[in-house]
Design a protein with these regions (language model features):
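Extracellular receptor-binding modules and their adjoining Ser/Thr/Gly/Asp/Asn-rich linkers
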Residues: 2-5, 10, 55-57, 72-78, ...
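Extracellular/surface-exposed low-complexity repeats and stalk/linker segments enriched in Gly/Pro
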Residues: 2-48
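Beta-rich globular "head" domains
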Residues: 37-39, 84-134, 197-208
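Short, surface-exposed terminal/edge motifs of secreted or surface/virion proteins that either
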Residues: 41-71
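Surface-exposed loop/edge segments in extracytoplasmic proteins
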Residues: 62-66, 72-77, 135-145
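C-terminal interaction-tip segments
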Residues: 74-76, 80, 183-209
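Exposed beta-sheet edge/beta-hairpin loop segments within beta-rich domains
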Residues: 97, 164-197
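Terminal beta-strand-rich extracellular "head" domains
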Residues: 119-170
Length: 209
């Protein structure tokens, strides 16, 4: 059994003053729209991640709807061959979000899954998560010694670097996120090719104004 909550105008709930508390539609109400309470929610039925739910941060007489960006997690597993090619071929972890949007990374978990045969080897190789085209770093250098070269399943938890807070808007807008080897050579070893690296990134997509 279902009940139609919304009327033909896309409005669902209003308060005692008949101001709108909850609504939906294909077009987000314009700035300065009226009759939406502060904190009113708008479900954008044509939206996607980061643009599906909006909240009125303005007033009843002058609305200002802003997207509510939810945190999602993207998991990407790299093969042994991909790990050993990260210097020449960085691996895309999150695709570019679209014009006027940026990816805000909350945390990164790297999981080395040891295949049981032989380890990766490295000398001065480190990893970094960065915005693809601009090369702006999202994290500081992720030390691979004691991590990627282990002969057991190993986990590294990484948080974004504060330096990214000073990035120009053009360096982070509509940019994909990639994992890169910043060392002087490729990671080697694991001749059996049975080690993998699982990259889990928690992130939000925000719309720049």
């Amino acid at each position: 059994m279902s009940t139609n909550l919304f009327d033909n105008s896309g409005y669902a709930l209003s308060d005692s003053d008949k101001d709108i508390v909850l609504a939906k539609g294909t077009t987000v109400p314009a700035d300065a729209a009226t009759d939406f309470v502060t904190g009113a929610l708008f479900i954008h039925t044509d939206g996607s991640n980061g643009t599906a739910l909006y909240v009125n941060e303005g007033t009843t007489s002058s609305a200002a709807f802003k997207p509510v960006a939810s945190v999602v997690t993207k998991n990407v597993e790299l093969t042994s061959a991909e790990v050993k090619a990260l210097r020449a071929t960085p691996k895309e972890i999150i695709a570019a979000p679209g014009a006027g949007k940026m990816i805000v990374v909350e945390s990164i978990a790297l999981q080395l899954n040891y295949g049981g045969t032989n380890a990766f080897t490295e000398t001065t190789d480190n990893l970094v998560l960065e915005y693809s085209d601009s090369g702006t770093d999202i994290t500081a250098a992720i030390e691979t010694t004691g991590f990627i070269d282990q002969t057991a399943d190993t986990v590294a938890l990484v948080y974004p670097a504060t330096i990214a807070a000073a990035a120009s808007a053009t360096a982070v807008t509509n940019e994909s996120v990639v994992l890169k080897n910043t060392g002087d050579g490729e990671i080697a070893g694991n001749a059996a090719g049975n080690n993998t690296l699982l990259v889990s990134v928690a992130y939000r997509v925000v719309t720049l104004v």
